[in-house]
Amino acid sequence: KLPAGKVEGTYFYETDLPEYPEGIPVHAEIDVDPANGKIRIDLTRNVDNVPLGINMTESTTLASCRMATLNVLGSEIPRCSGAFRCIEVTMREGAVIGKPKMPAATCAATSNLCSAFASHLHALYAKLQPGLGSAYGTVGVPASASVISGRAPRYGDKDYVNQILMGYWGGPATGKSDGWLTCGSASTQGAISQSSVEVSELQHPIIVEKLSIRQDSSGAGQFQGSPGATISFYANKASVRFIFYSGSREIPPRGVRGG
């Protein structure tokens, strides 16, 4: 399915940590060995754990590698332990991408850095051969997909906490097609259902003033990356806490192969 070859590269995840003024480096090396039926991914050159909750875990690291590889191989390859054994991942303990070492925090191990890392793997496969992989996509959880909490006056001031997913968009272009609008990030792959504006307003004390496709936000190229979202919403006669952790404001998602 894949040509023999080796690709490697570094992407940067933006951060306010003073140790990484250019961003946290995300590095991976991929070695495709069709003769032996193996794909080897080396992550040992990634930096040590950082004092943030974005450190990845062994499980999210393995899942990202398997997901990106199986996406490139296609749907006819079964998603099973036999296929997983053909993808050999080398990581180290105490790395920001790999096995965390106490007291490293991993509360956001499935989003921010995970999104950047999974996108990076897809982009590396795009370097291997035309028609493979994808460009970089959404990183983190934008304000349009906030976790909201508070008390709901409509329901007897009961406490609530929930995540609403409105405008979790910006799917990257692939080697064969335009980006899928509701893809979300590389770590969700379009598998998360989008929240209804009307239902969200009924369930929570919020008003959604605007939700629209952001103008001129697509990625240009042979195939086009899908656009992002513009959203405006606010609390409705109640105190509401909105929490989100977006990324890529300073380091936007990149194209591949000249896109």
Report the location of each language-model feature.
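Glycine/proline-enriched, intrinsically flexible loops and inter-domain linkers
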Residues: 1-259
